[in-house]
Curated annotation (Swiss-Prot):
Temperature dependence: Optimum temperature is 37 degrees Celsius.
Record flagged with keyword Hydrolase: yes
Lineage of the species this protein comes from: Bacteria, Bacillati, Bacillota, Bacilli, Lactobacillales
Keywords per UniProt: Carbohydrate metabolism, Glycosidase, Hydrolase, Polysaccharide degradation, Virulence
Native source organism of the sequence: Streptococcus agalactiae serotype III (strain NEM316)
Pfam families per record: Glyco_hydro_88
InterPro entries in alphabetical order: 6-hairpin_glycosidase_sf, 6hp_glycosidase-like_sf, Glyco_hydro_88, UG_Glycosaminoglycan_Hydrolase
Protein name, per record: Unsaturated chondroitin disaccharide hydrolase
Amino acid sequence: MMKIKPVKVESIENPKRFLNSRLLTKIEVEEAIEKALKQLYINIDYFGEEYPTPATFNNIYKVMDNTEWTNGFWTGCLWLAYEYNQDKKLKNIAHKNVLSFLNRINNRIALDHHDLGFLYTPSCTAEYRINGDVKALEATIKAADKLMERYQEKGGFIQAWGELGYKEHYRLIIDCLLNIQLLFFAYEQTGDEKYRQVAVNHFYASANNVVRDDSSAFHTFYFDPETGEPLKGVTRQGYSDESSWARGQAWGIYGIPLSYRKMKDYQQIILFKGMTNYFLNRLPEDKVSYWDLIFTDGSGQPRDTSATATAVCGIHEMLKYLPEVDPDKETYKYAMHTMLRSLIEQYSNNELIAGRPLLLHGVYSWHSGKGVDEGNIWGDYYYLEALIRFYKDWELYW
């Protein structure tokens, strides 16, 4: 077992701001799901067998084909909704999507990047787990093989964007703590140790480099392509190289417990607590994060609801594994309820118009001006996943 570097675990500041809140009831969660599904059904008619753009434009998604890194989240929303109500209309459309994903991997359409997990886990892995569909399994394993092509032995990580091996692209990103779950699944299905080894190596490379000593996270981290030595952490989506991009922090909060399920390394619990406490201590009054954790109330900056929704899923997952004696366990429980309640009551969509998101006020890419204070499809997915998690004993797609 490899070592994870020691990180600072902050004490949760003023835990009563969470502990004094009321837990969501099952009826409240069910009402939130029903409300979300009303918009989902409108969007099904709007998208047809196509997909939403990654983010909305003036709070309306445009329609696109299956060529973005985000398309799997739409199909994931369909599967989550199907698991809630067993509507065969949802199943049929989601399955047609899965066939589109099989075609995409067979023809290698717009797949030269690291986001194979985001594409294939909530779409194809989901269908295999729900229906045992062999085409869904075929697509998933082929996608895992494609992701394996980006593995760099020198440094032991999956390279993010760009041409493989080039110095200016020789880096990992924290997002891939979710993408490597595709490799764990491939190992689970095939028994081939190569998938698990790459996933494990990438996890440790991330834990020891992209996470700072204070448990905040860089977005990306560079390595030397000749030696594999760690070089530097920088941002691409965050405010600065020194700040902590909220969604990146949330990828860590969710990616760690997902990996802990498969690795069972106790060091991961400490890392989770460090990253989660850092996130919770920088939430504003309404408990929904700004797009970078450097900002809080009065900054005039937009929220990123997708980061908060993702963090809720991560906390919910890790509560399964935290020992009962953990002093923060009760606070985590109340914190995730408080965050999800705020999303439901203050940030969920109320206008039933074709193309509207389920969740408002997200940020796609602040520096490039894309999807700023807009809905985004991963925010919709993780919001709906969080609701389903709170509603039933749900078998993960990840």
